[in-house]
Regions:
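The feature marks the mature, well-folded catalytic cores of soluble enzymes
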Residues: 1-144
């Protein structure tokens, strides 16, 4: 018997049985139960909130209801002007005054309760998202 065969034989003889060490079950991230409810639960676990417009309420009224004390509301969406347009911010010093940023996300990740924002949504002004106090993300349920 060669040394290689001897080593392999020892390994085979000393291998533990698979029943001795049962592997834990791992939840799959891509489960097919990707629902709005699951997204909201995961978002809340991260410290986020789901804000919905009340019946008959226009978007600007919903923002005013949710953020009554905030003065500088920056918008990156065409359906809401806010007090400042994101395109008009040219420096981080200007963004430092922003209380609320309103932006649209192309998709949300149900499994983690997070949303995707890129340079496109932030008009290449990513620093605004880091400096603002609150971010309102518009997200369609079909994009979860």
């Amino acid at each position: 018997m060669t040394s290689r065969e001897e080593i392999l034989a020892r390994l085979r003889n000393n291998r533990p049985h698979s029943t001795d060490y049962v592997l834990p079950s791992l939840p799959l991230l891509g489960e097919r139960t990707a629902t709005r409810q699951r997204f909201e639960e995961n978002l809340k676990a991260l410290g986020g909130q789901v804000l919905e417009q009340q019946e008959g309420e226009i978007f600007s009224e919903a923002i005013a209801r949710c953020f009554p004390d905030e003065k500088v509301i920056c918008s990156a969406v065409p359906e809401f002007d806010g007090t400042l347009r994101l395109e008009n911010i040219t420096s981080p010093q200007q963004a430092d005054k922003v209380d609320v940023l309103v932006v649209r996300s192309p998709f949300g990740i149900v499994e983690t309760g997070s949303v995707f924002l890129s340079e496109k949504e932030l008009h290449h002004r990513n620093f605004v998202a880091h400096l603002t106090q609150h971010i309102v993300v518009l997200l369609s349920e079909k994009n979860l």
